[in-house]
Amino acid sequence: MACRWSTKESPRWRSALLLLFLAGVYGNGALAEHSENVHISGVSTACGETPEQIRAPSGIITSPGWPSEYPAKINCSWFIRANPGEIITISFQDFDIQGSRRCNLDWLTIETYKNIESYRACGSTIPPPYISSQDHIWIRFHSDDNISRKGFRLAYFSGKSEEPNCACDQFRCGNGKCIPEAWKCNNMDECGDSSDEEICAKEANPPTAAAFQPCAYNQFQCLSRFTKVYTCLPESLKCDGNIDCLDLGDEIDCDVPTCGQWLKYFYGTFNSPNYPDFYPPGSNCTWLIDTGDHRKVILRFTDFKLDGTGYGDYVKIYDGLEENPHKLLRVLTAFDSHAPLTVVSSSGQIRVHFCADKVNAARGFNATYQVDGFCLPWEIPCGGNWGCYTEQQRCDGYWHCPNGRDETNCTMCQKEEFPCSRNGVCYPRSDRCNYQNHCPNGSDEKNCFFCQPGNFHCKNNRCVFESWVCDSQDDCGDGSDEENCPVIVPTRVITAAVIGSLICGLLLVIALGCTCKLYSLRMFERRSFETQLSRVEAELLRREAPPSYGQLIAQGLIPPVEDFPVCSPNQASVLENLRLAVRSQLGFTSVRLPMAGRSSNIWNRIFNFARSRHSGSLALVSADGDEVVPSQSTSREPERNHTHRSLFSVESDDTDTENERRDMAGASGGVAAPLPQKVPPTTAVEATVGACASSSTQSTRGGHADNGRDVTSVEPPSVSPARHQLTSALSRMTQGLRWVRFTLGRSSSLSQNQSPLRQLDNGVSGREDDDDVEMLIPISDGSSDFDVNDCSRPLLDLASDQGQGLRQPYNATNPGVRPSNRDGPCERCGIVHTAQIPDTCLEVTLKNETSDDEALLLC
């Protein structure tokens, strides 16, 4: 307390000056002696996009416009950074923010980590003190577009959590922490252990306004900001620019003094109200400078100190007499508190506007103006248009003239040398502004209007090496050496890009190589597999191809099938011609019988063959010119007697002529057209013909009567009936044995060749459906008794009883009904069928014919 009240012994004007300094720290009058370490925050940068950076160890932060209402829709932020190892303590002194349930309308937050809230407050209750755990904090304030209140005012203090000793204006807490003395006994725990409020418990309750007697007529009641008790102060302390009351009641609602003037000279001076004393809060002044000359006006602020509390005080300078925002030259605030400040207009007119809020005050400013090329009466010209300097600026080690005239011919230096300061150290002109300090205080590198060759002139009148320009590093301090730099890719970037591209190319080549290798391996495996299959196919192709359909028909291995699948119409016509040629040569007619049985045993075949042999169904040849003995026929058709002419001679086929083939009977539909000679089929029919020829006792060979030549034949000797029956039985047994041998031989050949065409000979097909087999049956011209020694008779005569017995279908309901002969017009449709009989006609005549085994034997 001694440190604080010792200044009260000074005269009154010194006390007022001290109180003005104390206004910078609310609630901490002891810090007035260290005002350069006290921060008073305004809104010049706090309510922008970036937070206001604060490095002072203590200070005051208020909401915009405090103690008036804060504006709507505003966002302000402050970032306080203390020294490493220190903590920050915040004490709220006034707080009035629009309240809500979760403080989501208007709010104040304190964050130890960015964007991570640790403290949020709103409403009208003063929040408790906040003690940080780190050496930095973020303070954010937000208001919506609705109701506005008075706002907040807080004081912060940074220091270590435990100090061995505290200053005389500080209080040592029980935990070793130091806080300002003003925070003691304020009903708030700034120490963290409540030790700053323990002694106050023994004192009486804080006095209230009713406990005091009314003040005199020339006094006013005030809660002293120093003693924290109510007292009476003289009226002269009101609106004097000094804060005496804790609630600022002595400096609120004061009348604003009038200031400003119209300046019309080539040069002049002006200053803030009460300069060098504090200007009154709420000052609003405007100076209009009109030199009447077209030349530029140079405006210099030789001293400048503004208050930054609340919205902050400011000075705006316009190019011209009008307050045109587009012609605003510069705005000076409390952050520009340094001298000298120079502003140059583009014409002979300037408008200067000074505005101060109603909270606190400062020393203000002092300014001079002059037309370019003129000097003030008390100044010395630098020469030319280089400006002016005063006698106090002569030989002070600082170049006020760009040409250094104020620092030449100094007594302590030789000619063409300049002093570093008033201590006698000098340096030559060649060492001026070459980015190398020759003076201990570095004055040879300050206020450089020109730089030595090889150096770059910065906008802040500094010089750096030209090689440092556009090197992505701020060497000037204001970033002017990195402005308007061309985009040049550094060498290391190019090197990295080349190396990276080479590596990528190598990886791409490796990937392509691996892909090609895998592809070649896959194709090799594929070729190996395909080569094996090709060899197998080649082996199959080297085998002998199966006989064609025509060859099989010519060899008699298969009968001609009309519905055999073909590949083209030409092939169908060739097969049809071949079938007609064979039928024409053999004198057969086609009969289609259903074939169903596939697996008859050999003994049934022998029996059927013997039965067919008895009925004469295998007799395909007869002697030429023989008379056929008539026989009784059981057929429904009338008996037909005609001379049966042989297609094949017993001796040779050479005796046959084309005329005999043209005149022969047996082919339905008339005489067949001349066709190429076909090889007679080598079948069981030839075997039968050979057997008949060998067993015949005919010694004389018959000849064909052709071209008027008579052919003589020897009549066979008469045979008794008993011998005829015995011979017939022996002949049938012989033919049966030969048929067994022929069947066994064909079965062995079928086991070696299982082609679909060979399966037709064995009665086996690849399908399970019933197939139709066309059977060639010779047509007999007459009927006679069967003679085993007579090879001229056909073995099968459809007109005879034996033939009718073979053709008689099986009918369970009417066994006596037999279909009519195949020769002649069909009884159902009236058309002569030359080849294939339609199914509609077969439904009547062949519905219940013999079994498939018998039909196969007929083939």
Curated annotation (Swiss-Prot):
Widely expressed in heart, skeletal muscle, brain, lung, placenta and pancreas, but not in tissues consisting of a large number of epithelial cells, such as liver and kidney. Expressed at very low levels in a number of tumor-derived cell lines. The chain crosses the membrane at residues 493-513. It is found in: Membrane; Membrane, Coated pit. GO terms for molecular function: integrin binding; low-density lipoprotein particle receptor activity. Keywords: Amyotrophic lateral sclerosis, Coated pit, Disulfide bond, Endocytosis, Glycoprotein, Membrane, Neurodegeneration, Receptor, Repeat, Signal, Transmembrane, Transmembrane helix. Residues 47-159, 259-372 form the CUB domain. Its main location: membrane. PROSITE patterns: CUB, LDLRA_1, LDLRA_2. GO terms for biological process: cell adhesion; endocytosis; integrin activation; lymphocyte migration into lymphoid organs; neuron migration; neuron projection development; regulation of growth; signal transduction. Residues 514-859 are cytoplasmic. Gene3D superfamilies: Low-density Lipoprotein Receptor, Spermadhesin, CUB domain. Disulfide bonds join 47-76, 103-122, 166-178, 173-191, 185-200, 215-232, 222-245, 239-254, 259-285, 375-388, 382-401, 395-410, 413-426, 420-439, 433-448, 451-463, 458-476, 470-485. Residues 33-492 are extracellular. Residues 165-201, 214-255, 374-411, 412-449, 450-486 form the LDL-receptor class A domain. Residues 748-757, 801-814 have a biased composition (Polar residues). Belongs to the LDLR family. It is linked to Oculopharyngodistal myopathy 1: A form of oculopharyngodistal myopathy, a muscle disorder characterized by progressive ptosis, external ophthalmoplegia, and weakness of the masseter, facial, pharyngeal, and distal limb muscles. The myopathological features are presence of rimmed vacuoles in the muscle fibers and myopathic changes of differing severity. OPDM1 inheritance pattern is autosomal dominant. Amyotrophic lateral sclerosis 28: A form of amyotrophic lateral sclerosis, a neurodegenerative disorder affecting upper motor neurons in the brain and lower motor neurons in the brain stem and spinal cord, resulting in fatal paralysis. Sensory abnormalities are absent. The pathologic hallmarks of the disease include pallor of the corticospinal tract due to loss of motor neurons, presence of ubiquitin-positive inclusions within surviving motor neurons, and deposition of pathologic aggregates. Probable receptor, which may be involved in the internalization of lipophilic molecules and/or signal transduction. May act as a tumor suppressor. This is Low-density lipoprotein receptor-related protein 12.
